[in-house]
């Protein structure tokens, strides 16, 4: 009987890993689409005539819209226990928004805002439920390495997406124009369709991913309890969001203004940052399973100087170093922050916990996006110093969260 039990566990673990990999490939094509668009979005918005204050405000408003609604959709996912419908609907809205950017006419930046925000809406609908489904499977193999694998494959797509855009610009062989941007957005519709096709395949093959994790209670959704460790963790994430630009738009604009590289090659810089992102996600994700949130503190400290290197420097090599620092922060946070929520929450409230965390993150990103825009207009020193101080403060809070989490975790009883 014991042998059968071990075989069942092995089979369950293999199925869980297959599901994680399949969802990671879905994310690969999703990021290929989204990051390909992100690599030129700042320049596209500038070409359409969008003012700088609107550029940063839309980035923050998108974060606010997406993250504030994630709490609601996270609650609904947990309450109904129907995670897949939210994932499917969210991905459909998300993926169709990028090719629609090809329909924006000259000086039509207001219409572009609609499609940008609709993409954020799609993410809000899908993200808590999708993260919850992956976290259920991750309990079989370890949260850190599971989310790290997903983030690494994400970033393969994030590297390829900008290369697609670069190829479109190179093949047209003319000065960057609205037509080139439209063609690029249309080509990104191909990976968008691949993403949706694979997602439907995942739904058919794994209709109940929540069965990968054993339930801690018999009843349905329980009271949403915020532990001290989770509260400090969310506070750390919110402070990190104050100064860490998770959008490439402002960095893109600043590099473009400095003229250190031709506009057509800007996506290559973004692709490089996403490559660093992938390596960072793998390294710090695996490290998370060994040392917990200390890994996140290390990663955030490594990303702290990116403001001085990108905004404060005017040489290409300094910008490369700055984007390396920025990529480390993006990769570590994308994998370890997701792992952290899974570690600090119960199965029954997993999607709601993701929604709450991302609400804190999004409100902070939106609230301080105007300050970031103001500091950028004032001086490179002002924005760089603000970035440094907020990231260092967040790293301290992540260390505190790890200490509290250890204190809250029951020690195993020795027989």
Q: Where are the language model's segments positioned?
A:
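Symmetry-related core transmembrane helices of the 12-TM Major Facilitator Superfamily/SLC fold
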Residues: 182-200, 383-401
């Amino acid at each position: 009987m014991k042998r059968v039990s071990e075989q069942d566990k092995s089979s369950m673990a293999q199925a869980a890993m297959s599901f994680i990999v399949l969802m990671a490939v879905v994310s690969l094509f999703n990021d290929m689409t989204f990051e390909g668009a992100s690599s030129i979005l700042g320049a596209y918005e500038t070409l359409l005539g969008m003012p700088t204050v609107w550029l940063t405000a839309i980035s923050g408003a998108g974060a606010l819209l997406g993250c504030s609604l994630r709490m609601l959709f996270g609650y609904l996912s947990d309450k109904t226990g129907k995670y897949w419908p939210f994932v499917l609907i969210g991905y459909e809205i998300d993926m169709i928004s990028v090719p629609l950017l090809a329909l924006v006419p000259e000086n039509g930046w207001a219409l572009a805002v609609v499609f940008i925000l609709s993409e954020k809406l799609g993410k809000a609908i899908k993200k808590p439920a999708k993260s919850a489904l992956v976290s259920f499977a991750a309990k079989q193999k370890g949260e850190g390495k599971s989310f790290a694998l997903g983030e690494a494959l994400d970033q393969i797509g994030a590297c390829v997406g900008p290369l697609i855009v670069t190829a479109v610009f190179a093949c047209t062989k003319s000065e960057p124009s609205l037509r080139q941007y439209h063609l690029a957005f249309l080509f990104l519709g191909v990976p968008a369709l691949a993403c949706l096709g694979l997602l439907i395949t995942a739904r058919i093959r794994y209709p109940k991913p929540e069965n990968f994790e054993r339930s801690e209670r018999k009843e349905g959704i329980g009271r949403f309890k915020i532990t001290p460790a989770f509260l400090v963790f969310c506070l750390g994430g919110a402070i990190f969001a104050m100064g860490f630009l998770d959008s490439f738009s402002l960095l893109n604009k600043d590099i473009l203004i400095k003229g250190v590289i031709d506009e057509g090659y800007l996506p290559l810089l973004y692709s490089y940052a996403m490559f660093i992102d992938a390596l960072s996600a793998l390294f710090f994700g695996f490290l998370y399973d060994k040392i917990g949130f200390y890994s996140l503190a290390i990663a955030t400290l490594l990303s702290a100087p990116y403001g001085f290197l990108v905004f404060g420097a005017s040489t290409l090599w300094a910008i490369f170093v700055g984007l390396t620092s920025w990529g480390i922060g993006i990769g570590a946070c994308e994998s370890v922050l997701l792992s952290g929520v899974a570690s600090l929450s119960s199965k029954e409230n997993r999607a709601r916990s993701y929604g709450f965390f991302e609400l804190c993150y999004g409100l902070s990103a939106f609230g301080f996006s105007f300050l970031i825009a103001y500091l950028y207009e004032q001086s490179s020193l002002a924005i760089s110093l603000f970035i440094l101080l907020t990231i260092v403060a967040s790293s301290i809070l992540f260390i505190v969260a790890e200490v509290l989490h250890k204190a809250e975790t029951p020690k195993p009883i020795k027989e």
